[in-house]
Amino acid sequence: MTRSTRQRERETAAKQEEEEDSEEGVRECPECGSDNLVKSSDRAELVCNDCGLVVEEEQIDPGPEWRAFNHQERQEKSRVGAPTTQTMHDKGLTTTIDWKDKDAYGRSISSKKRSQMHRLRKWQERIRTKDAGERNLQFALSEIDRMASALGVPRSVREVASVIYRRALKEDLIRGRSIEGVATSALYAACRKEGIPRSLEEISEVSRVERKEIGRTYRYISQELGLEMKPVDPKKYVPRFCSELELTEEVQSKANEIIETTAEEGLLSGKSPTGYAAAAIYAASLLCNEKKTQREVADVAQVTEVTIRNRYQEQIEAMGIHG
């Protein structure tokens, strides 16, 4: 390789680096070298927060040119479709043919056109799922959506559950197991990852499979997919249980205090978080003179009265309270 060739290559590489730097944008202040840069959206400027130098001006705004002040206005002014979502088997990128049988002006279409649209609609539904894998995914995601709606969990949980199920399908973990079982386990795993307090009992109530199968499948997919799950904090169940029992914030605060104090003593290890929270609420209701029976608390927490009695005795002994 000649000297002039090497020189040209070095110049080309340097030019490419400059272009990459310009594409990435300014990373530090050319005046003081600080990386504490603040973007001023109203002036379209990039300003150094340390020395005040305007590093960039007249920046391009990638947002829409229109303004909206609420969700309805944003929907009306937006000229794009819905974002992609993991909760649909085709990620929401399909075309849906409306069933209204009306034209763009709201007028009814002819019978010939109606027949044509009916055929198109039927074929559209058929080609949406090209193989058994997609049909499996479509059914599973609809099950996740149904159960999530019944449980009243946020949309983020549905997205996470859908991603977990897609991973399980890709790793061929569905073989030998029911679609409903894996879908329910994915939803339970998503609730735990997102910190949404839902017990296996609550999940099994809205599912079409038994609790034992859900637990068994959940342990299998979490191990195979390497899902890192933190232990469920019993305090996350306290607000919902107290609300259903119509207990005051004083009881809620006392229950949290009991959980914190007794957990530090090591009582929580190996215990069911729902039963532990239920016992703390029962103890707090007695201490705050808002007594609820063990049966009432057990019904709300979906645990047995025996569990509440056992956890209650352990907790009051650890707190040094004589019941």
Curated annotation (Swiss-Prot):
GO cellular component annotations of the record: transcription preinitiation complex
InterPro entries: Cyclin-like_dom, Cyclin-like_sf, TFIIB, TFIIB_arc, TFIIB_CS, TFIIB_cyclin, Znf_TFIIB
CDD domains: CYCLIN_TFIIB_archaea_like_rpt1, CYCLIN_TFIIB_archaea_like_rpt2
Sites where the protein binds Zn(2+): C29, C32, C48, C51
Zn-finger segments (TFIIB-type): 24-56
Pfam families: TFIIB, Zn_Ribbon_TF
Keyword field: Metal-binding, Repeat, Transcription, Transcription regulation, Zinc, Zinc-finger
Biased composition (Basic and acidic residues): 1-16
Transmembrane parts of this sequence: none
Molecular function GO terms recorded: DNA-binding transcription factor activity; TBP-class protein binding; zinc ion binding
One example of a Gene Ontology biological process annotation: transcription preinitiation complex assembly
Sequence repeats: 142-225, 236-317
Region (Disordered): 1-35
PROSITE patterns on file: TFIIB, ZF_TFIIB
Keyword Repressor among record annotations: no
Function according to Swiss-Prot or TrEMBL: Stabilizes TBP binding to an archaeal box-A promoter. Also responsible for recruiting RNA polymerase II to the pre-initiation complex (DNA-TBP-TFIIB).
Stated family: Belongs to the TFIIB family.
Classification via NCBIfam families: PRK00423.1
HAMAP family reported in the protein's UniProt record: TF2B_arch
Name of the protein this chain belongs to: Transcription initiation factor IIB 7
